[in-house]
Amino acid sequence: MEAAAAAAAAAAAAAAAGGGCGSGPPPLLLSEGEQQCYSELFARCAGAAGGGPGSGPPEAARVAPGTATAAAGPVADLFRASQLPAETLHQITELCGAKRVGYFGPTQFYIALKLIAAAQSGLPVRIESIKCELPLPRFMMSKNDGEIRFGNPAELHGTKVQIPYLTTEKNSFKRMDDEDKQQETQSPTMSPLASPPSSPPHYQRVPLSHGYSKLRSSAEQMHPAPYEARQPLVQPEGSSSGGPGTKPLRHQASLIRSFSVERELQDNSSYPDEPWRITEEQREYYVNQFRSLQPDPSSFISGSVAKNFFTKSKLSIPELSYIWELSDADCDGALTLPEFCAAFHLIVARKNGYPLPEGLPPTLQPEYLQAAFPKPKWDCQLFDSYSESLPANQQPRDLNRMEKTSVKDMADLPVPNQDVTSDDKQALKSTINEALPKDVSEDPATPKDSNSLKARPRSRSYSSTSIEEAMKRGEDPPTPPPRPQKTHSRASSLDLNKVFQPSVPATKSGLLPPPPALPPRPCPSQSEQVSEAELLPQLSRAPSQAAESSPAKKDVLYSQPPSKPIRRKFRPENQATENQEPSTAASGPASAATMKPHPTVQKQSSKQKKAIQTAIRKNKEANAVLARLNSELQQQLKEVHQERIALENQLEQLRPVTVL
């Protein structure tokens, strides 16, 4: 029944071709494969309005296709799925005669399919082109309600071919018997993915000579399982599918195409973007390949490792260099997981015949790919892994949640080798609360933590606003976290506190304002008022000095011996140990002041070091490219030289002998 319907359709198309196209086109000659494929497509388009895309072809349309017409909507969708320009499709519609007669009969439909195949093969869209032997047309369609696949057998072993019915179940083309399994294993699979050597076994490469001059869609890349025909292939008499002498016809081997339909991703996109869109299965495969090179997905792959991996794809060095330039968005000589996926996808596309884009497509941008990764693995893992590696007292905190309670907690920390009473603690808290501004919103991360974080590539900078910037704004510097107590000379700590303590009253001398009022204390600690007052001499001018002084002047200030401050009276010796408490409180700003110039210098040096490393990597890559190019040119030179010698020998033999 099917063969009769196909023959009737072909006969009707061939008989009506002369009148269907206007000015006497040549007779429409179809091979058996084209007859079966075209009649099947016509039946689907004719029955799409009634049966829907998931139903099989109606029997009425298949038995008598000459009496049916294809619905305009399904035909338009099918033609758009050829991915030809709208102008070309309009020209095909005019040439096939459908625009003149007002409908798509079998004749117009078949001629249009031949013209689509000619346009996809690079031939001009003319009626004369349908005389040539052409491959079957290729279509790529998308449906939101489900996945629909049109499939052809992987390879033709004879002159008869059967096209599977339309199905809406993913991977639902089933084998009918063991004979089909043998045929499928001996036929090349139709997955268009040509992955590097480290791909899993089911990612099989399809040679470009087998009909894949381009990727049809990004969806096809990651569906490795072959889509088998529902019905067994019909073999000509006297031949067997498993015989070693069986070879497909040469022209039919180039006719085979697999046109598939993949469900669109979450956001709709135009057809030109589809090849550059990474599917879920592709992303999973790329991530697995990345983890084989770098177990930590939040880390990166160095340029040398990526180079050794990608050169296995056998692409030329200039193409690989261009892919690297496209994918390495931040130009740091290393690939993160999104950049690796983009580079891998570009290499796979190039291996399958797609020309490389002029710029990185939007669907391969690192921001787009990073948003597609699961958040627990990508957004939080870098920070969590770093926090786990630090001791408990050095872990970074949330920089936007600094409260006064943290300052008070710092004040509550016991000072070694000291007997601090509760009243002393309250006094110290009040002093700190007066010194600090009300709207402190930054965490006092140490320069050590800041530098260690900056030294890690691609990680966020958790460092707070520098002391120099805070002083320029006239604000007080953030209090550093507690450090192991160090012995500071009294004069040194006093001198450093001139610069970094806020403007508060100091001593009671005639030259300086009186000290701040402190809560009452027991008698043994009354001298703390004097010691704390002496810790803050001449502080009213500190902010202006800090705003005007440059780092160079501060360095000079630190290198000079500290000058003795004006004292109101001499302290007894038994109060020397008690004075260590405010000295310890001042040691934090003193240490911060000593280390203040270092973050800027280290930041500059780290930037310079990173720039030098990037330049070294780029030079090494360029050197490798030039070395390979040099070897290729040397080989060509050697071949040309040998050719020249051979030609000279031939010329010498052909030259007539001159007799003197």
UniProtKB/Swiss-Prot annotation:
Compositionally biased region (Pro residues): 512-523
Tissue: Expressed at high levels in the cerebrum, cerebellum, lung, kidney, and testis. Weakly expressed in the kidney. Isoform 2 is down-regulated during progression of prostate cancer.
Name of this protein: RalBP1-associated Eps domain-containing protein 2
Region (Interaction with RALBP1): 514-660
Biased composition (Low complexity): 582-594
UniProt keyword Phosphoprotein present: yes
Coiled-coil positions: 601-657
Entries under PROSITE patterns matching the protein: EF_HAND_1 (PS00018), EF_HAND_2 (PS50222), EH (PS50031)
Organism: Homo sapiens (Human)
Gene Ontology BP terms: endocytosis; endosomal transport; epidermal growth factor receptor signaling pathway; protein-containing complex assembly
SMART domains: EH
Role, per record: Involved in ligand-dependent receptor mediated endocytosis of the EGF and insulin receptors as part of the Ral signaling pathway. By controlling growth factor receptors endocytosis may regulate cell survival. Through ASAP1 may regulate cell adhesion and migration.
Keywords: Calcium, Coiled coil, Cytoplasm, Metal-binding, Phosphoprotein, Repeat
Entries under SUPFAM superfamilies matching the protein: EF-hand
Modified residues (Phosphoserine): S254, S493
Residues annotated as binding Ca(2+): D328, D330, D332, E339
Localisation per UniProt entry: Cytoplasm
Domain EF-hand: residue ranges: 315-350
Record region (Interaction with ASAP1): 561-660
Subunit composition and interactions: Interacts with EPN1; the interaction is direct. Interacts with EPS15; the interaction is direct. Interacts with EPS15L1. Interacts with RALBP1; can form a ternary complex with activated Ral (RALA or RALB). Interacts with ASAP1; the interaction is direct and this complex can bind paxillin. Also forms a ternary complex with RALBP1 and ASAP1. Interacts with GRB2.
GO CC field: cytoplasm; cytosol; plasma membrane
GO molecular-function terms, A-Z: calcium ion binding
Chain intervals for the UniProt region annotation (Disordered): 169-208, 433-616
Domain EH per the UniProt entry, residue ranges: 34-147, 282-373
